[in-house]
Curated annotation (Swiss-Prot):
A GO molecular-function annotation: proteasome binding
Key word Magnesium present: no
Biased composition (Polar residues): 20-34
Organism: Talaromyces stipitatus (strain ATCC 10500 / CBS 375.48 / QM 6759 / NRRL 1006) (Penicillium stipitatum)
GO cellular component assignments: cytoplasm; nuclear membrane
Gene3D superfamilies: Tethering factor for nuclear proteasome Cut8/Sts1 (1.20.58.1590)
Subcellular location(s) of the protein: Cytoplasm; Nucleus
Main localization category: cytoplasm
Protein name: Tethering factor for nuclear proteasome sts1
Region Disordered, residue ranges: 1-83
Coiled coil (residue ranges): none
Domain of life where this protein originates: Eukaryota
Protein family per UniProt: Belongs to the cut8/STS1 family.
Subunit structure: Binds the proteasome.
Length: 315
């Protein structure tokens, strides 16, 4: 008879480990991931793993070169220094720059010749603007309520500005005369503007103070005569005929009180009968009551002879 051997009781906690767990392969996780296909979510997990990994396990980053910036290095020592020539010239106004240039040319005369040949020729508009600036300074210096003829007190106040204007006229006028100026239209345009400025010169109660004004009229009249002679040599004075200079010169002569009569006579001699009727007080025009329509204009417009009786019958 078989005897049963009593087995000792098994503790309950041993039963917790008696379950069968799924068999696991002994291969490494890297081998398992290589044996199956990669999925999109696996790539995201790998990125998370790499980002959470320690720097020692992360791949090495190759340094990229930074762009080279052209920056001025700050000077270690700050000290005062003079401005460079371009920066210095930027701070100078017109008057200061003119004074510096004149001083340099006076010290070095050879530079003056270089400036004269390098500088552009002054235009009529710029020159007349300079003269108008002198004229404006003169007009603003005249005391208020002086009347048409100014007193000696007013003359003493403005004589320096008057001399500046007269000197400028005397210096600028020869520049626009032949042979220095080859274009007659430029010369006539300047003389027209310069004569207007002379008209605005003040008149003085003391006759000797008017010498400067009378001298200016005399010089500008000689300039008109010279330019008219030069213009008459070119194309028979066609520019004088069709430019209306006969009318302008006649108006200047009237405003000056007949001080430009020599220029009027020269123009009448240059144009002959073609311009005589356009000049009041010269030739036949003086007997026609100042008729402003010249024979030249009548011929060009085709109205010459209209209104005149036509003779019929034997001559």
């Amino acid at each position: 008879m078989n005897s049963l051997v009593a087995t000792p009781p098994v503790p309950p906690h041993f039963y917790e480990h008696s379950r069968f767990s799924p068999s696991r392969s002994m291969s490494t996780p890297a081998q398992q991931s290589s044996n199956r296909k990669r999925k999109a979510e696996d790539d995201g997990n790998d990125v998370d793993i790499r980002m959470s990994a320690s720097p020692t396990n992360s791949p090495a980053f190759t340094p990229r070169p930074l762009p080279n910036r052209q920056m001025k290095r700050s000077r270690p020592n700050v000290s005062g220094r003079p401005l460079s020539l371009p920066r210095l010239l930027e701070t100078l106004d017109t008057d200061a720059l003119r004074s510096v240039l004149q001083a340099v040319c006076q010290r070095h005369p050879e530079l003056g010749d270089e400036v004269v040949h390098t500088a552009p020729r002054p235009s009529v508009s710029s020159t007349l603007q300079v003269l108008r600036n002198y004229q404006s300074t003169l007009q603003t210096s005249i005391p208020l309520g002086s009347g048409e003829y100014l007193s000696d007190y007013a003359y003493n106040r403005v004589k320096q500005h008057l001399f500046n204007l007269l000197d400028a006229l005397s210096d600028f006028t020869p520049h626009f005369l032949p042979p220095n100026e080859s274009q007659t239209s430029v010369s006539l345009t300047y003389l027209d503007g310069a004569t207007d400025i002379i008209h605005s010169l003040p008149k003085w109660q003391t006759p000797r103070h008017n010498i400067g004004r009378d001298s200016a009229y005399e010089e500008i009249c000689k300039a008109w005569v010279l330019v008219i002679r030069e213009a008459a040599k070119r194309g028979g004075g066609i520019q004088l005929q069709y430019g209306g200079w006969d009318q302008k010169l006649a108006k200047h002569n009237e405003t000056s009180g007949g001080k430009l009569q020599d220029a009027i006579n020269e123009l009448q001699n240059s144009l002959g009968w073609m311009g005589s009727s356009a000049l009041p007080g010269v030739g036949a025009a003086g007997t026609q009551g100042g008729d402003q329509t010249s024979i030249r204009e009548q011929l060009l417009s085709g109205t010459y002879g209209m209104g005149m009786p036509l003779k019929v019958g034997p001559w």
